[in-house]
Amino acid sequence: MEYRRGDLLCQFIFWILWMIIKKLLNSHRVYGKSAAMPDKRDIAPQKQKWMMCLVLAVVTLALFWQVNQHDFINLDDPIYIHENHHIRSEISLENVYWAFSTKYAGVWYPLTWLSLMLDHQLYGLNAGGYHITNLVLHILSTLLLFWLLNRMTGSLWRSAFVAALFALHPLHVETVTWISKRKDVLSTFFWMLTLCLYVYYTEKPVIRRYIAVLVS
């Protein structure tokens, strides 16, 4: 059952990639004369942007895919997962309350605990699934960084270069491949998301966009 759940996540990842490909195929539509002209942040054609997202995702996935065969390690993983009965039990209001109210192993990481609970529901103690979750979060952060830089500068290739450097830099290997570093990939994801939403807010400062920034 644990391997079955891991297979489902892999299928979900490739489904996302397939949706990106479909978006590329449909991005050639011709706009009428009344369509709004893109501003300087939309210099690169949409097809190129989606293609770059696809390339970044596939390259990062290919580089780190082997982590799905890796196991837990003895540094922090046993304390965080094996010896933590809250992680190894079902997600419940009691466990959610514990995640937000308790300082465990000397740290307070409520979102990390919740994400590990969800992993345990999906994969049990199949370490590969936990590693893949880290990888998916890292890929999403990479794509958000690319969107952010391209939106701010309008420069496709420079934005892609910086995003690729972020995705593939050796300093990030530990973060992606060590399950106990879930806190890092989670915080990076929400940081990138917050920056993207803030840029979105500055383009049209309305209250709902500002609330989205605060929530993220």
Can you describe what each PLM-predicted range is?
Residues 15-16, 20-216:
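Polytopic membrane enzymes that build or remodel cell-surface glycoconjugates and lipids
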Residues 3, 7, 26-28:
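Intrinsic-disorder-associated, low-complexity terminal segments enriched in Asp/Asn/His/Tyr and depleted
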